[in-house]
From Swiss-Prot:
Localization in the cell: Cytoplasm
Binding positions for NAD(+) per the UniProt entry: 62-63, 67, 129-130, 140, 157, 159, 170-175, 194, 229
PANTHER family: NAD KINASE
Lineage summary: Archaea, Methanobacteriati, Thermoplasmatota, Thermoplasmata, Thermoplasmatales
Record's protein name: NAD kinase
One annotated GO biological process: NADP biosynthetic process
Length: 272
């Protein structure tokens, strides 16, 4: 078994959690550290783009998990070090018991949809949560034309447009008023950031669809942001194309059902 450890930047506490896991796992398991983890744990660290493992343990939060999914290869086990951590599987007080489950093989690998994204036909990195087209300056509304499978859907004036996966529907899209999609739903959510008209509502389209966002008007420079990790400048006349990727995001899970995650990570926080 090859296990990789990736931790949040400058997080000594994350390294302490990693060390506690290392002390429990079998000595014959091969251990790999990213450059950040190696600072605290010793040894030679690998750049995250060079990491490939049977299990990648992400210690930090959703940002750490998304960074792994965009750059490394292997199913991810996320440990939440604070915040909601919807993409993480376990909390700090569950590390010991979950490590023993990992050793015994009492887990499953869940796959989730990823998006492939193009600017004017040039393919970029895939993303797991969402692709966001956003104004490049604060308080400067933009005009976007949206097409689904080549059919014109709408022209919208807003601060931005979000196209989210079922996994990402609980994140940025949700804060923009988009619906929650269960991971088993084959769809994408198109939602809008501060639309000029309140009559414009989010739309769910089939996962097999291709969504195109065209930057309309003059002097409409904007940004394309993938999972909050990668950022690209786009200008008037550019077209962003988004569709389902051939690749999948893979997560290590100890939960019995997707409803456990929904309850623990979303509903419980809303109710409380």
């Amino acid at each position: 078994m090859k296990v990789a450890f990736v931790i949040r930047k400058d997080c000594k506490r994350c390294a302490t959690i990693a060390k506690s896991i290392i002390e429990l796992i079998p000595p014959d398991w091969e251990k790999i550290y990213d450059t950040e983890a190696a600072k605290f744990l010793g040894g030679v660290g690998k750049d995250i783009t060079e990491i490939s493992a049977d299990i990648i343990i992400a210690i930090g939060g959703d940002g750490t998990v998304l960074r792994i999914l965009q750059n490394a290869k292997g199913p991810v086990l996320g440990i939440n070090m604070g915040g909601l951590g919807f993409l993480t599987e376990i909390e700090i007080d569950e590390v010991g018991s979950s490590t023993y489950k990992l050793i015994r093989g009492e887990y499953k690998i869940n796959e989730a949809m990823k998006l492939k994204v193009y600017i004017n036909g040039r393919r970029l990195e895939d993303c797991t949560n969402e692709a966001v087209v956003h104004t490049d300056r604060i308080a400067r509304i933009r005009q976007f034309k949206i097409y689904v499978d080549g059919h014109f859907l709408t022209t919208i004036k807003s601060d931005g447009v979000i196209v989210a996966t079922p996994t990402g529907s609980s994140s940025y899209s949700s804060s923009a008023g988009g619906p929650l999609l269960l991971p088993t739903v084959r769809g994408m959510v198109i939602s809008y950031l501060a639309p000029y008209s309140s009559r414009i509502k989010p739309v769910v389209v089939p996962s097999e669809s291709t969504v195109e966002i065209k930057i309309a008007g003059n002097d409409q420079d904007s940004l394309l942001i993938l999972d909050g990790q990668k950022e690209y400048k786009i200008k008037s006349g550019d077209t962003v194309s988004i569709s389902m990727s051939e690749e999948k995001a893979r997560f290590v899970s100890f939960r019995e059902s997707i409803y456990d995650r929904l309850r623990d990570k979303v509903i419980k926080h809303v109710v409380n």
